[in-house]
Regions:
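Conserved S-adenosyl-L-methionine
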Residues: 1-79
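C-terminal catalytic and target-recognition region of SAM-dependent MTase-like enzymes
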Residues: 75-167
Length: 167
């Protein structure tokens, strides 16, 4: 959709005493230039097995004005296919369950292994990014993923691990 976060609404920083409207306008013009040069965005596919999660994400996308840029599906990881709009290799970005609250402490190794199998079968040549709370689980998807980012959502340590998807 190529829409900057917060565009189309006033930002709190605009009321700061040190705010410089000229600099703000310059940054906005540069973003518009980049957007024009970037061309069409890659296809975006949002999938979850829970219809409520998909509906909630869709409502958020609607409020952000990007709902039409996303292909929406409900389904299991084992049935995951690339976006129907094609577009060639892209990025498979996933936030699979971490355990604890979502799986009541169940064993997630099979789920992560299934994600790895589907990635190899359906997304070979793509890149993958996986947000995990346990790096060992990510090895079920693909050994050797590299740490791209460490963060603490909700006070829990997590890592975004990335790498190529090989067959």
């Amino acid at each position: 959709a190529r829409v900057a976060a917060g565009s189309g609404r006033p930002m709190a920083l605009q009321s700061w005493p040190c705010f410089e409207p000229g600099t703000w306008a310059s940054v906005g013009a540069e973003a518009d230039r980049w957007r024009a040069e970037a061309g069409e965005p890659p296809p975006i596919l949002a999938v979850d097995r829970d219809e409520g999660a998909v509906a909630s994400a869709r409502a958020n996308a609607e409020r952000a004005g990007v709902v039409e840029a996303i292909e929406w599906r409900t389904g299991a990881i084992s049935d995951l296919l690339p976006p129907s709009s094609g577009g060639g290799p892209g990025l498979l970005l996933t936030n699979p369950p971490w355990g604890g609250r979502l799986s009541a402490g169940g064993d997630l190794r099979n789920l992560y292994a299934t994600l790895g199998r589907v990635a190899r079968e359906q997304f070979a040549g793509w890149r993958i990014g996986v947000l995990v709370a346990e790096r060992a689980l990510a090895r079920q998807i693909r050994p050797g993923l590299s740490e791209a980012l460490q963060l603490e959502p909700g006070g829990r340590r997590a890592w975004l691990l990335t790498g190529p998807v090989d067959r």
